[in-house]
């Protein structure tokens, strides 16, 4: 029953990823952690989230805004080693909670009409530094990039595709770091192997949903995921 529940979680998370371009880990990690432990949840979500990102990119690569991708990933390349250093200096649980509170505060401000413009490469690079640092420390690469892209003039399709590339690349780097430090265990692999085709199914369903929502509906779902990521960071696992 636990395996079946894990596979259902994977389908739902893949659908969210296919619709929005991100969010696999936001959905999967808290739920998988309750079923099999946090380390396994992060490993499973990392491996399958990368596959989900690849599927999204394959179907939407023509919509990717490459100048934004380059600016953000340059910053991410700086932020990842910074995060690896910081993780040895601070209590990562406290940092995760603080990050969650900040994300919720920013989400509330955005919902109340705050405008954050992030159209210049330097601002997008700083976003990448924050994303990489937080990703290495807490696994939360998404919120800085999601908030930044909301402050650009990109369409919903371009936002979705650009999120998939930037966060998928950052996720791959973080997954490699976790594997090198012994945090990806063999016991996670059977679930991953069984779930690979289900990721494709969920991703395709999410793409179908994306094709039928309005830009305003897409932005609303993205904001909901932002709030969920903030809450998930605060709630103990």
Region roles according to the model:
Residues 65-76, 96-100, 119-130, 158-165, ...:
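Cytoplasmic-side transmembrane-helix entry/capping segments in multi-pass membrane proteins
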Residues 30, 83-88, 147, 207-208:
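Small-residue-mediated transmembrane helix hinge/kink sites in multi-pass secondary transporters
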Residues 39-112:
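Membrane helix-loop-helix hairpins that form the core translocation module of multi-pass transporters
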Residues 41, 83-88, 92-96, 135-140, ...:
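Hydrophobic alpha-helical transmembrane segments in multi-pass integral membrane proteins
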Residues 3-70, 128, 132, 140-203:
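Small-residue-rich hydrophobic segments that form or flank transmembrane alpha-helices
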Residues 77-81, 92-112, 194-207, 215-237:
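Selective transmembrane alpha-helices of multi-pass membrane proteins
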Residues 58-62, 89-90, 112-116, 137-138, ...:
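Helix-loop junctions at the membrane-solvent interface of multi-pass transporters
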Residues 35, 63, 89-92, 153, ...:
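Helix-loop interface residues and adjacent transmembrane-helix termini in multi-pass membrane transporters
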């Amino acid at each position: 029953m636990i395996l079946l529940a894990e596979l259902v979680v994977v389908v739902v998370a893949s659908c969210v990823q296919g619709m929005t371009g991100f969010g696999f880990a936001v959905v999967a990690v808290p739920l998988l952690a309750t079923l099999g432990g946090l380390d396994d949840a992060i490993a499973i979500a990392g491996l399958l989230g990368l596959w989900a990102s690849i599927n999204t990119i394959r179907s939407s690569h023509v919509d990717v805004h490459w100048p934004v991708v380059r600016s953000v990933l340059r910053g991410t390349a700086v932020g990842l080693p910074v995060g690896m250093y910081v993780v040895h200096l601070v209590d990562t649980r406290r940092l995760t909670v603080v990050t969650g509170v900040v994300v919720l505060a920013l989400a509330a401000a955005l919902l109340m009409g705050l405008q954050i413009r992030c159209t210049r490469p330097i601002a997008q690079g700083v976003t990448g530094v924050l994303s990489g640092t937080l990703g290495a420390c807490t696994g939360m690469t998404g919120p800085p990039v999601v908030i930044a892209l909301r402050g650009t003039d990109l369409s919903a399709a371009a936002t979705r595709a650009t999120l998939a590339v930037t966060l998928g690349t950052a996720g791959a780097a973080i997954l490699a770091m976790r594997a090198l430090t012994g945090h990806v265990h063999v016991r996670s692999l059977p679930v991953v192997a069984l779930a690979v085709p289900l990721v494709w199914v969920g991703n395709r369903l999410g793409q179908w949903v994306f094709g039928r929502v309005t830009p305003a509906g897409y932005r609303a779902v993205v904001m909901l995921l932002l709030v969920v990521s903030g809450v998930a960071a605060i709630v103990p696992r």
